[in-house]
C-alpha cells in the first residue's frame, strides 16, 4: 500500500488527478493498511512530501493485532510479538497530523468497535484531528455499501472534506 500511494503521488497528473489532494480509505484489512500509511515517513523512505496523504478514512479496520496470536488464524499467520507491535497501527506514532475519520458500524462486533474507538483516541492523543464515526444500522458487511454512490453517509463525509 505504501508503494501504491507513492506511485499515485508521482503519477496522479498523468491521469487527471491532483497529487496534492490524495486521500485513502480501506475496509477491514484495508482499514489496517490505511492505518499503516499514517505512520509512514514519506520524506525519509520515499523522498516525497511528509504530508503526502491529506485524509484517511479507515472503515471497520484492524488496528490492534494483539488478539490475533490467540485466534484461529495464528497457525496460518504465525505472528510473533514483535510483528504484532510493528504491524499494529494503534502502537505506531503518526508521522504527521492529517484529517482522519475512523468509521465502524454500530452493529459490528464489540472488538471492531473497541479497536476503532481506541485507534481514534490514540490518534487524538498524538495531535491528529481524528473523528470517530459509529454508523447506525451498519455492520461489517453492509457498511461498505455507503461507497456505492455519492448519497451514502460516508461518501457525504468524504465530499465535505476540504
Spans of features found by a protein language model:
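Alpha/beta-hydrolase superfamily serine-hydrolase fold, recognizing
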Residues: 1-162
Amino acid at each position: 500500500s505504501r508503494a501504491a500511494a507513492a506511485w499515485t503521488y508521482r503519477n496522479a497528473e498523468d491521469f487527471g488527478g491532483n497529487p496534492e489532494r490524495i486521500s485513502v480509505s480501506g475496509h477491514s484489512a484495508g482499514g489496517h493498511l490505511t492505518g499503516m500509511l499514517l505512520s509512514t515517513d514519506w520524506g525519509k523512505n520515499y523522498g516525497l512530501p511528509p504530508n503526502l496523504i491529506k485524509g484517511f478514512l479507515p472503515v471497520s479496520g484492524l488496528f490492534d493485532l494483539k488478539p490475533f496470536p490467540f485466534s484461529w488464524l495464528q497457525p496460518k499467520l504465525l505472528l510473533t510479538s514483535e510483528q504484532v507491535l510493528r504491524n499494529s497501527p494503534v502502537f505506531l506514532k503518526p508521522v504527521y497530523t492529517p484529517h482522519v475519520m475512523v468509521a465502524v458500524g454500530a452493529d459490528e462486533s464489540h472488538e471492531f468497535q473497541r479497536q476503532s474507538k481506541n485507534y481514534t483516541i490514540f490518534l487524538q492523543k498524538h495531535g491528529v484531528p481524528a473523528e470517530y464515526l459509529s454508523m447506525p444500522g451498519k455492520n461489517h458487511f453492509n457498511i461498505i455499501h455507503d461507497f456505492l454512490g455519492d448519497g451514502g453517509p460516508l461518501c457525504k463525509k468524504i465530499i465535505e472534506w476540504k
